[in-house]
């Protein structure tokens, strides 16, 4: 049986994982990201247009590059959303055999002059192009600022010229692939969109912000996490209907989805008795962990 995803040494340099799509585990990721459904719908629609409209319309009419950029604070679920998006797109085309390639940008960078540029060019012109020629392909470019750094903000004295050349290579390859491979979609993510080169941003068909969750989303994330734990520790199941739970959920505003789930883990570890028997977890344990998490965020922000 072929393993999904493939993540071994046989993959080309720069490719971290390769998935056959659709894949239910990726669909679960899509469902786990709690955000405005209208935003999800728009994102999915944009990705589908890449495969229905882009191949049939001249680029002089619609200058589509096949690039979507997801931006937002760390922990908001951009990478999971991108993976889930790939599944949902493939699910929309039942007759086509889609593939998801995950790029690991840090394996492409090198201190040796010219090596980063060559590695980037080889990845795009060979590995990605070959996959796109074989069938519809979605490429996840996580932390895209690593490969497409803003050249206007880089000092040639502090940063090797190779970084500039790597960004040049990404832009050149995106243009070539957009021209030759209309059944190819890049989904990029960035925690620091201000660090992404403006020429890369201009090539994006959509730049979508993945925001921190609001009050209702915070509550939904917290309930989902507690319900999952309740399958193993039934006593936790009563917390979502407990007194002050809504207040507790409201206090999560300002935290990202990942941090909210970690808050629950921290609450379980707040007291030895709760750690021994998680059924004893209380709303007050949760509120204490939330206050601590927000205090740490506040201190971290002051240090920057």
UniProtKB/Swiss-Prot annotation:
SUPFAM superfamilies: P-loop containing nucleoside triphosphate hydrolases (SSF52540). Gene3D superfamilies: P-loop containing nucleotide triphosphate hydrolases (3.40.50.300). SMART domains: AAA. ATP binds at residues 75-80. Signal peptide: none annotated. GO terms for biological process: defense response to virus. One of its GO terms (molecular function) is ATP hydrolysis activity. One of its GO terms (cellular component) is chromosome. It comes from the Bacteria. Keywords: Antiviral defense, ATP-binding, Nucleotide-binding. Pfam families: AAA. Oligomerizes. Homohexamer. Forms a 1:1:6 CdnD:Cap7:Cap6 complex. Regulates complex assembly in a CBASS antivirus system. CBASS (cyclic oligonucleotide-based antiphage signaling system) provides immunity against bacteriophage. The CD-NTase protein synthesizes cyclic nucleotides in response to infection; these serve as specific second messenger signals. The signals activate a diverse range of effectors, leading to bacterial cell death and thus abortive phage infection. A type III-C(AAA) CBASS system. Prevents the CdnD:Cap7:Cap8 complex (also called CdnD:HORMA2:HORMA3) from synthesizing 2',3',3'-cyclic AMP-AMP-AMP (cAAA). Binds and disassembles an active CdnD:Cap7:Cap8 complex, inhibiting the complex's ability to synthesize cyclic nucleotide second messengers. An AAA+-ATPase remodeler, in the absence of foreign threat Cap6 probably maintains the Cap7 protein in an open, inactive state. Once activated (presumably by a bacteriophage protein) Cap7 binds to and activates its cognate CD-NTase (CdnD in this bacteria) to synthesize cAAA, a cyclic nucleotide second messenger. Belongs to the AAA ATPase family. This is CD-NTase-associated protein 6. It comes from Pseudomonas aeruginosa.
């Amino acid at each position: 049986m072929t393993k999904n995803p493939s993540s071994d040494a046989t993959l080309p340099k720069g490719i971290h994982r390769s998935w056959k799509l659709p894949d239910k585990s990726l669909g679960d990721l899509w469902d786990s990201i709690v955000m405005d459904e209208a935003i999800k719908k728009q994102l999915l629609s944009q990705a589908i247009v890449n495969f229905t409209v882009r191949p049939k319309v001249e680029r002089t009419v619609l200058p589509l590059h096949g690039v979507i950029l997801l931006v937002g604070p760390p922990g908001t679920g951009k990478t999971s959303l991108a993976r889930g998006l790939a599944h949902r797109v493939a699910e929309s085309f039942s007759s086509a055999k889609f593939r998801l390639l995950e790029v690991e940008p840090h394996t492409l960078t090198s201190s040796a002059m010219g090596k980063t540029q060559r590695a980037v060019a080889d990845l795009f012109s060979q590995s990605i192009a070959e996959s796109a020629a074989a069938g519809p392909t979605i490429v996840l470019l996580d932390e895209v600022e690593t490969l497409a750094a803003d050249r206007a903000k880089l000092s040639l004295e502090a940063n090797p010229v190779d970084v500039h050349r790597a960004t040049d290579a990404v832009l050149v390859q995106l243009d070539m692939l957009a021209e030759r491979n209309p059944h190819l979609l890049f989904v990029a993510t960035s925690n620091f969109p201000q660090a992404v080169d403006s020429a890369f941003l201009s090539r994006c068909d959509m730049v979508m912000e993945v925001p921190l969750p609001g009050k209702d989303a915070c509550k939904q994330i917290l309930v989902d996490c507690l319900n999952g734990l309740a399958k193993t520790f039934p006593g936790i199941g009563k917390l979502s209907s407990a007194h002050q739970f809504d207040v507790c959920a409201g206090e999560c505003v300002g935290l990202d989805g990942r941090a909210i789930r970690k808050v629950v883990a921290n609450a379980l570890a707040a007291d030895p008795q709760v750690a021994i028997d998680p059924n004893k977890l209380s709303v007050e344990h949760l509120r204490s962990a939330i206050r601590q998490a927000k205090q740490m965020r506040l201190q971290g922000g002051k240090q920057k």
